[in-house]
Amino acid sequence: MRINGETKLTGIIGYPLKHTLSPQMHNEAFKALNLNFLYLPLEVAEESLPQAIYGLKAFNFRGINVTIPYKEKVFPFLDEVATEAKTIGAVNTIVHDRGRLIGYNTDAPGFLLSLKENDVEVTGKKVLLLGAGGAARAVAYALLTAGAELIIANRTIDKAKELAKDFQGVGKISEILELGDKPISLAPYHMAVNTLPLGMHPYENQMPAVDFTGVTSDFVAYDLIYNPAETKFLKASKEKGARTINGLSMLLWQGVLAFEKWTGVSPPVKVMKKAIGLSC
């Protein structure tokens, strides 16, 4: 990879970034297309976030990804936010265009592309969304726009109600459930999506309180976590014969869309898959 005065800079801002796979995914794609671009991990403490975002203009970055915990916090520092990102309430991709920083959300369409890749149809289907935080918002928006009937389960009912209120004009949210000690039956649903940190470090031995009784091979278990590749939730689902998808697929497709926005060209998807350990 060549780096010179004409190299266009991209990257990811978040905290922490120790386990991010995005740099290797994007840099391998740049290399494959012989593009003079570089993708950097930019670990930024919260008190330095304003300077970091404004610095994108100073250092003439072409764009960046935004990850936890800043997807909602970057809004005040942007010149423009795309309508979809405003509705979702989160920005995960920023494009620097002629001195203006424009915020987008590629998580939602990336999630839908991951469903398409895995031949999962959600139109008219009942989907259980586990969680109502920042990660859940993009998934909820994606599912609702695809015509799914959404049921939201969260430990804090008020937060689930807030999400439902924000998206009441987007699609059908038919029920809000309390995610507590009493397990929620998965049997009535076509798919369940875990957006909670239960299953990732340091909660590897935990999963949402759900009951797998009645789950069949038609059921789809989706976990946004990709490290570990198989969470306790996915493992239990697989043991019941269900189809399972981890977060690598969404990571890939949101990255594909961000890549296109920065470069104006379609990335080599197979190269990106290989870079993050996804089978082609």
UniProtKB/Swiss-Prot annotation:
Pfam families: SDH_C (PF18317), Shikimate_DH (PF01488), Shikimate_dh_N (PF08501)
Pathway: Metabolic intermediate biosynthesis; chorismate biosynthesis; chorismate from D-erythrose 4-phosphate and phosphoenolpyruvate: step 4/7
Gene that specifies this protein: aroE
Complex formation: Homodimer.
PANTHER family per UniProt: BIFUNCTIONAL 3-DEHYDROQUINATE DEHYDRATASE_SHIKIMATE DEHYDROGENASE, CHLOROPLASTIC (PTHR21089:SF1), SHIKIMATE DEHYDROGENASE (PTHR21089)
Coiled-coil positions: none
Binding site for shikimate: T20, L21, S22, T67, N92, D107, Y226
Gene Ontology MF terms in the entry: NADP binding; shikimate 3-dehydrogenase (NADP+) activity
Listed InterPro entries: Aminoacid_DH-like_N_sf (IPR046346), NAD(P)-bd_dom_sf (IPR036291), SDH_C (IPR041121), Shikimate_DH (IPR011342), Shikimate_DH-bd_N (IPR013708), Shikimate_DH_fam (IPR022893), Shikm_DH/Glu-tRNA_Rdtase (IPR006151)
GO BP of this protein: amino acid biosynthetic process; aromatic amino acid family biosynthetic process; chorismate biosynthetic process; shikimate metabolic process
Protein name: Shikimate dehydrogenase (NADP(+))
Source organism of the structure: Carboxydothermus hydrogenoformans (strain ATCC BAA-161 / DSM 6008 / Z-2901)
Annotated residues for binding of NADP(+): G131, A132, G133, G134, A135, N154, R155, T156, I157, D158, K159, L224, G247
EC annotation from Swiss-Prot or TrEMBL: 1.1.1.25
Reaction equations catalysed: shikimate + NADP(+) = 3-dehydroshikimate + NADPH + H(+)
Reported function: Involved in the biosynthesis of the chorismate, which leads to the biosynthesis of aromatic amino acids. Catalyzes the reversible NADPH linked reduction of 3-dehydroshikimate (DHSA) to yield shikimate (SA).
Assigned protein family: Belongs to the shikimate dehydrogenase family.
Keywords: Amino-acid biosynthesis, Aromatic amino acid biosynthesis, NADP, Oxidoreductase
Active-site residues annotated for this sequence: K71 (proton acceptor)
